[in-house]
From Swiss-Prot:
It comes from Bacillus cereus (strain ATCC 14579 / DSM 31 / CCUG 7414 / JCM 2152 / NBRC 15305 / NCIMB 9373 / NCTC 2599 / NRRL B-3711). Keywords: Endonuclease, Hydrolase, Nuclease, RNA-binding, tRNA processing. RNaseP catalyzes the removal of the 5'-leader sequence from pre-tRNA to produce the mature 5'-terminus. It can also cleave other RNA substrates such as 4.5S RNA. The protein component plays an auxiliary but essential role in vivo by binding to the 5'-leader sequence and broadening the substrate specificity of the ribozyme. Gene3D superfamilies: 3.30.230.10. This is Ribonuclease P protein component. PANTHER family: RIBONUCLEASE P PROTEIN COMPONENT. One of its GO terms (molecular function) is 3'-tRNA processing endoribonuclease activity. SUPFAM superfamilies: Ribosomal protein S5 domain 2-like (SSF54211). The gene is rnpA. Its EC number is 3.1.26.5. Belongs to the RnpA family. NCBIfam families: rnpA. It catalyses: Endonucleolytic cleavage of RNA, removing 5'-extranucleotides from tRNA precursor.
Amino acid sequence: MSIDMKKKHRIKKNDEFQAVFQKGKSNANRQFVVYQLDKEEQPNFRIGLSVSKKIGNAVVRNRIKRMVRQAITELKDEIASGKDFVIIARKPCAEMTYEEVKKSLIHVFKRSGMKRIKK
């Protein structure tokens, strides 16, 4: 499956990141911190990614971002719309496989009620 994070699904501007940090709610597990901000007027969700330089060099950070984007692409039908999310990767992500990243994201999304329940 290709990585397909269209422009409408991304947060890029610093002031948009800051709004989510300041006004949003956060949930975390050992691998990720996820901030969420409700935006009722928005027809879809948007994602912003942050991977600190403390985690590793550019190769490691970009690998983590690619895995998170791919997981979000696969989960996009299950993620609630009308919200902005900022996902911050923590140190343990550097050694994780794609399956572990996806499982961890599902865990933190379910924990905070951000993920739609599909039966």
